[in-house]
Amino acid sequence: MLNKYTFIFEIGWRDSKTGRLKPYEYRKKTQMSINDARVYARRLANTQNVLHVRFYKEMY
């Protein structure tokens, strides 16, 4: 069985009209393996107007 963790994803967006950076968006996902988190981050990074995606493993 794979270990499951809680990850926090930081997403940097660009406004499509002005080209300016929007405030970062944070998403919290639970019960994900490290590989699942990488796939999710890659999928987010391929979204239009996304500049970067960082993810952190939540520590208790």
Where do the PLM segments sit?
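Short N-terminal "domain-start" leader segments
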Residues: 1-15, 55
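Generic short amphipathic/hydrophobic targeting helices enriched at N-termini
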Residues: 4-7, 30, 46-49
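Short linear motifs centered on Gly/Pro in flexible linkers and helix caps
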Residues: 11, 32, 42-45
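A short, exposed loop/beta-hairpin motif centered on an aromatic-Gly-Thr core
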Residues: 19-36
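Short, mixed-charge low-complexity intrinsically disordered segments
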Residues: 42-60
